[in-house]
Design a protein with these regions (language model features):
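Walker B catalytic acidic pair
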Residues: 165-167
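Conserved D-loop-proximal element of ABC-family nucleotide-binding domains
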Residues: 172-173
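Phosphate-coordinating catalytic segments in nucleotide- and nucleic-acid-processing enzymes
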Residues: 1-159
C-alpha cells in the first residue's frame, strides 16, 4: 500500500513530490490512505525522458527465466524487478563511435576488469581468464555489471534518469 510511505504525523496526511530537471517539472502526490493511486501533474516535456529503476536486490543472477515465470505465475517480486528484467532482456546496440556514453563503458570495463555478455538468456562476466556465470560473481559486481549492460543495450543513455535504490549496498572495496 503506497500510503504507508506517508508519515502518519504529517498534518496534511499527504506526500508531495516534485522533480525539476532542465526546466521540466514532474509532480505527484498521494495520501496516507492511498493504496495504489497517485495524482500526477507533469509537463509534456517529460515524455522524451526515459526512466530506469534499479531495485535494492540485484537482478542479474535471477534473470534467466524470470520474464517467463513472472508472466505466467504470481511471484513475490514487485513490478520494478519485472521492468528491469525486460530492460536487461534487450540485446546490446551496435557499437558506435558517436555514443556519448562510450567513455563511461570504457572506464567501467577498465576499472572492473571485465566485460558483460548475455548468451542464451544467461549473463556472463568475461575476464582474461574466460567467461564466468553471473551468479558466481559477488553481488556488488553483479549490480555494476547490470549498469554496464544497460548502457551497452541503450536502456541507459544520455537522456535516461536513473533511480538506483541503495547504490552503496554490497559495493565493498576489494
Amino acid at each position: 500500500i503506497i500510503g504507508n510511505l506517508v508519515s502518519k504525523g504529517l498534518p496534511s496526511g499527504r506526500a508531495n513530490i516534485a522533480v525539476t530537471i532542465d526546466s521540466k517539472v514532474l509532480q505527484y502526490s498521494f495520501s496516507s490512505a492511498a493504496k495504489t493511486t497517485v495524482k500526477l501533474e507533469t509537463d509534456e516535456k517529460w515524455n522524451d525522458r526515459h526512466f530506469i529503476y534499479i531495485p535494492p536486490r540485484e537482478m542479474f543472477s535471477l534473470f534467466e527465466g524470470f520474464i517467463g515465470l513472472s508472466s505466467k505465475r504470481e511471484i513475490s517480486f514487485d513490478q520494478t524487478y519485472i521492468n528491469l528484467a525486460h530492460a536487461l532482456a534487450l540485446p546490446v546496440l551496435r557499437e558506435s563511435e558517436d555514443n556519448p556514453l562510450r567513455p563511461a563503458v570504457e572506464l567501467l570495463e577498465r576499472e572492473l576488469q571485465f566485460k558483460v555478455l548475455q548468451m542464451n538468456g544467461r549473463f556472463y562476466i568475461q575476464t582474461e581468464s574466460g567467461n564466468m556465470e553471473a551468479h558466481l560473481v559477488a553481488e556488488g559486481l553483479r549490480k555494476l555489471a547490470s549498469i554496464l549492460y544497460l548502457i551497452l543495450n541503450g536502456e541507459i543513455n544520455a537522456n535516461t534518469i536513473l533511480f538506483w535504490d541503495e547504490p552503496e549496498a554490497n559495493l565493498n572495496p576489494a
